[in-house]
Amino acid sequence: MPLFFSPSKPGAVCSARWARALLLALVTLTAQWAWVGASHAQARDGAREGVDVGGNSAFGKLVSASEIEQASQQQYQALLRQAAARNALVPAQDPQVKRLRAIAQRIIPFAAPWNERTRQWKWEVNLIESPQRNAFCMPGGKIVFYTGILTSLKLTDDEVAMVMGHEMAHALREHARERMGKTAATGLGANLLGQLLGLGDIGQTVTNYGAQLLTLQFSRSDESEADLVGMELAARAGFDPRAGVTLWQKMAAASKGAPPQWLSTHPSGSSRIADIEANLPKVMPLYERARRKP
C-alpha cells in the first residue's frame, strides 16, 4: 500500500494527516538544528571583533567536506589543464600572477578562525586569460582570477583584496556544501508537499518554481555574507575595507542592464554598498591596527 494517497480516495485523510505530521517534524527538527548553530555562533561572535554573520547552517552537515574538497581539486586541475591547452593560463612569472599571490599570502593567515579545515588546505592562486569579470575560490583553497576583472575594472590592490576575500569567504563558510544540503532538503520537502496535496503535474511545476526561488534567495544570502566576511579578512590583512564601496561602484557601472535583484543570484550593487558601509565601523579598527604593524 502506498504511503500517500490522493485526497479523493478512501483513507486519504488519515494518510494526509500522518504525512503532515511527518513533514512538520522534519521542518521543526531542521529549525532546531539551525537555532542551536546560530546560538553557539552568537556566543562565539560576542567575544570577537569584526562582522557578525552567525553560525554555519546545519544543512551543510549532510554533505562530506572532504569529498567536496577532493572533487574541487580534480575540477581545479582540469580547469588549469584546459586553460593551458589553449594558452590561456598566465605564467607564474607574470606580474599580475605575482600580485595576486602576494595579496593572497597576506589574507590566508586570517582564514583559520573562520574554518579550521583551512590549516590543511593547500592554497593555490592562478590567473586565466579571459574577458570575464570573474573570480572564484573553490573548497580547499583553489583560487582563480580572470584577467577581465583586473583589466576592465582597473582594480587597485585594495579592491583585488576585497574580491579575493569575498571568494575565499564562500569557501571558508562552506556555501557550496550548504547549498547541496539545502537542495536535498528542498527536494524532499517539495516531493512530500506535492504528494500531500495531490497536485500531480501542476504541483510539480509549482514546487519546482518555488524551489528555484528558494535557491536564488540562498545564493543572495551567501553573497551578502561573503561580502562581509571577505571585507573583514581584507581588513585584518591590512587592506582598506572602504575599497568594497569603490569595487561595487565599478561593478555596477560595468553591469548595466542586469536583471532585477529578486530574480538575480546576486544582490544589487546598491544593496551591497549599503551593507558594506553599515559594517565599516566594525572592521575599520582592524584595518587601522594592521596598517600600524611594521
PLM regions: where:
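A Zn2+-metalloprotease active-site environment signal
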Residues: 2-7, 13-21, 32-294
